Amino acid sequence: MGNQTTVAETTNTIAGSQTFADVDLRPICENMTNSEFRAVFATAQVTAVEKLGARITALQRWSQDERNRVSKWFGRNDETTRMRLLTGLTKVLAVVRGFNEHNVVRSGSAGDLATGCTPHPRGTENEAAHVCAPDTATHTIAISARFCTMRPWTDGADSHVSTIIHEATHFHDTMSSTDDKYTITPFLAPWGRSNPDLAINNADSIAGYVVDGDD
């Protein structure tokens, strides 16, 4: 059974009877222990919280620099766009702060499957993580293999930090974001300027806007 073990439990209903349960002992990341993973995730989580907080503050102040930043990623900087980001990122921040050992799980684990969403038809080989958008009760984030070998942080490409933000935007009680354009690259912001109606709802555009550059 690989990295699973069979555990016998004595019941309290019939003398001497036992039930058997398979306990999944596989780590979240194959290249590190769960303790090491928790430390890696916590470090990225702290940075994500800091970056989200910085953007929320900047959106509240609404300086010309922030207006330019919003235009760079979303092709417009009107009040509707500002409020979409301000309201949404405030909710995203709360979810990111709430990620913990109970709702950060391995992709394909019982905790992942319990969210009720069916597996992605393309599989998980090319994804870093996924969530079940309607899962507003637990906000579970499932970690896939790509996350385990990603860079911890960078301001111009996918990373642990951008992945955490990206996934948190998908929940229906945050921003109900979409995946019209994947991957943070130098081409993502120009795509957003050409497709503002899509970009304002695109998870990687939102994450790219949050992590872009130094504050």
Task: Give the residues covered by each predicted segment.
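Predominantly extracellular/secreted Zn2+-dependent metalloproteases
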Residues: 1-161, 171-215
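Walker B catalytic acidic pair
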Residues: 167
